[in-house]
């Protein structure tokens, strides 16, 4: 398959490469001028406008990028979606959101929900350092309630990742300073509760960090399932909750097996009439 045919294939299909350049387009169009009746079938791929080479290649922007560079990237984003879907996606988004999934992940720039290859309007997102979910964090608790009770999501993913800075910090005794030491306390508690298990990985720090990341996902999923809204929805089989780990070196997700929570029923608070109110008198 020649270069011209590869480029033509990319431009005619919905999963075309974002790496098509102006030179590639010119080559493709010149080639198709020699083909009978083919010009009208080609959808011109949006071209990314660049201010020139920057020191962050192959990424699209850098610390030296200007405001106009960011706006150009936004235009490319819009043009790419319209190229594949017309105005349908933005028309639907203009009418409101109805996401099917809540994604709870780490703030790490490498580990966002982009790995699901979804479109705007599909995923409701909450991210923080080390993808921590606990009952003391009003932000995550509010997001979970809103996602389940208002948006009616059907899937919830809690996703950790390899090479997580919050995990590495929790494996160290070095003080970070500011609010971060307090924020990472839940991960340190997980480390303390699994100290013997983690010591088995002392000869391989990367595997040790990966194991703690998995344990942290388990802890966050367990905390999420104990959330009042999640507990009720799970009892009614209205949602599924999955733990995931994203590998920043490969781009692939893997499932983290979540053990059964023996205290799950203790956190199932509800308004059902058959439940007697506790009264010691």
Curated annotation (Swiss-Prot):
It is found in: Cytoplasm; Nucleus; Mitochondrion intermembrane space. SUPFAM superfamilies: beta-carbonic anhydrase, cab. The lineage of its organism: Eukaryota, Fungi, Dikarya, Ascomycota, Saccharomycotina. It comes from the Eukaryota. GO terms for cellular component: cytoplasm; mitochondrial intermembrane space; nucleus. GO terms for molecular function: carbonate dehydratase activity; zinc ion binding. This is Carbonic anhydrase. It catalyses: hydrogencarbonate + H(+) = CO2 + H2O. Keywords: Cytoplasm, Lyase, Metal-binding, Mitochondrion, Nucleus, Virulence, Zinc. It comes from Candida albicans (strain SC5314 / ATCC MYA-2876).
């Amino acid at each position: 398959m020649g270069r011209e045919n590869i480029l033509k294939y990319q431009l005619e299909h919905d999963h075309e490469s974002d790496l098509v350049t102006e030179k590639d387009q010119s080559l493709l169009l010149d080639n198709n001028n020699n083909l009978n009746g083919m010009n009208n079938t080609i959808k011109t791929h949006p071209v990314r406008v660049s201010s020139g080479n920057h020191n962050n290649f192959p990424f699209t922007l850098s610390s030296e990028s200007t405001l106009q560079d960011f706006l150009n990237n936004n235009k490319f984003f819009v043009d790419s979606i319209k190229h594949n879907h017309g105005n349908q996606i933005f028309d639907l988004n203009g009418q409101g959101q109805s996401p099917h999934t809540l994604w709870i992940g780490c703030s790490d720039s490498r580990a966002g929900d982009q790995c699901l290859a979804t479109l705007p309007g599909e995923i409701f997102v909450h991210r923080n350092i080390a993808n921590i979910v606990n009952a003391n964090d009003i932000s995550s608790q509010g997001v979970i309630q809103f996602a389940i009770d208002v948006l009616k999501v059907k899937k919830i993913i809690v996703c950790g990742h390899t090479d997580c800075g919050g995990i590495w910090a929790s494996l160290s005794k070095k003080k970070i300073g500011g609010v971060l030491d307090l924020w990472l306390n839940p991960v340190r508690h997980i480390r303390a509760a699994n100290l013997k298990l983690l010591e088995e990985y002392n000869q391989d720090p990367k595997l040790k960090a990966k194991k703690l990341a998995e344990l942290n996902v388990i802890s966050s999923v367990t905390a999420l399932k104990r959330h009042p809204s999640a507990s009720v929805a799970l009892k009614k089989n209205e949602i599924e909750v999955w733990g995931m780990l994203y590998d920043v070196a490969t781009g692939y997700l893997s499932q983290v097996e979540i053990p059964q929570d023996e205290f799950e029923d203790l956190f199932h608070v509800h308004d059902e009439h058959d439940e007697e109110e506790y009264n010691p008198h």
